[in-house]
């Protein structure tokens, strides 16, 4: 096919779920890379990103890989969901996380 429409939410809040999962050439098809995208430069950058615990380096690797996949239009993103959250002013300590919208930090919340 030439084009398909889909949606997706990550399993956890880490660049891996956005970049490695969707753009590594060894994950083509159902494992994640559904556009069958392949670029050796991106593969190298993504492998470097998961091989370091230095957050500054990791950010640089992911940003460089992201620039390439955006420039090559591996996917065309149509929109990002916008959230509106109603909250009682008596609730304290709630932190909204758009990636985990149904997960609540109840140990830190109070009334």
Where do the protein language model's features map onto the residues?
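Periplasmic binding protein-like
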Residues: 1-29, 61
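Weak global preference for isoleucine
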Residues: 3-5, 17, 70, 103-106
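Bilobed periplasmic-binding protein-like "clamshell/Venus-flytrap" ligand-binding domains
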Residues: 4-7, 52-89
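Extracellular/periplasmic catalytic domains that process cell-envelope and extracellular macromolecules
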Residues: 13, 40, 69-71
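Short, solvent-exposed loop/beta-turn-alpha elements that line the ligand-binding surface or hinge
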Residues: 20-51, 79-111
């Amino acid at each position: 096919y030439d084009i398909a429409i889909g949606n997706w939410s990550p399993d956890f809040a880490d660049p891996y779920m956005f970049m490695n999962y969707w753009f590594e050439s060894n994950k083509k098809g159902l494992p994640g890379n559904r556009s069958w995208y392949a670029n050796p430069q991106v593969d190298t950058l993504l492998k470097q990103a998961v091989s370091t615990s230095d957050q500054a380096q990791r950010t640089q690797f992911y940003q460089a890989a992201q620039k390439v996949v955006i420039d090559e239009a591996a996917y065309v993103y149509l929109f990002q969901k916008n959230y509106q959250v109603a909250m009682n002013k008596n609730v304290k300590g709630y932190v909204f996380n758009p990636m985990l919208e149904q997960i609540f930090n109840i140990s830190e919340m109070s009334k």
